[in-house]
């Protein structure tokens, strides 16, 4: 019954916003249902003014299953550098789905094993993909696995079973650095940050394990000049520098925001601002970033999304003009225009989001 209601809502939305279909899409936004009965990608074309148009009524089936509940993760979906392929984790079936990105739709290429249990986060750089498996949540081990990505989107295993600092560490996100020669994984249960080095063949080694500046390192994003910015469940964010040899050193932090359950983090394209979602408080905080990577709190409540809104994933569009926010408690995706001073102005809201929905990526 719930799935029928969601399809009906998507149908109504598609009719309501059909007027924007006459204009060429400036980009797109993707999320996944994470439904245990069958995972689905929901896709939206983005117009020049930031509004979203639903594509594919009912979404695009991944050929895998989700868990039906939150994954406590960042990066459930990823787009390759050339905007050709969308990669999606299926945490319930231990698989990764590959979609070809078309102008107004998605086409499923294949479904592959994640070479581990409960995949929750995926990252891709050039022709190499890594997935983070939260096996510790299902009596297995936490690990990462790597794949080569062909020109047609086919995945070929490179390495698997590369363990984190322990068997069950509460991993949250895996991501490449901009050069593709490092991977970072956050471990919220051990308050640790793992750094893996990646050779020219895409093979990772490590990890080098470093203590987090505060409790519960969660989401993160790489900036410029070897800088990386991490959100922390304790209600704060910190900045680090990372070297090519895999060494991590704190620049500043933790910088408290006075909010609860600071989880997801995203940067502006010019690396002047960072935004974090405070899931427990129902709001978003903003930070400024200095040239040397030093973080300063800009606005503890840059957005008030509502006490029960449960804001989780957050993404910035490729043209750097818009932020999109997944609020599963409110059952919607919200879009905001980014001002030069880092403030955010509402431009769109899409309804019909399931509580289990996870991941948000924009182009």
Predicted regions, residues:
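Conserved beta-propeller blade signature
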Residues: 28-32, 85-87, 129-131, 183-185, ...
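Short loop/turn segments immediately following beta-strands, especially the blade-tip
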Residues: 44-52, 99-104, 148-154, 196-203, ...
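A short beta-strand motif characteristic of beta-propeller blades
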Residues: 56-68, 107-112, 157-164, 205-211, ...
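Beta-rich, blade/repeat-based domains predominating
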Residues: 63-82, 114-128, 163-182, 212-228, ...
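Asp-box/WD-like beta-propeller blade repeats and closely related beta-sheet repeat scaffolds
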Residues: 106-173
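Blade-level signature of beta-propeller repeat domains, shared across WD40, Kelch, NHL, RCC1
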Residues: 328-363
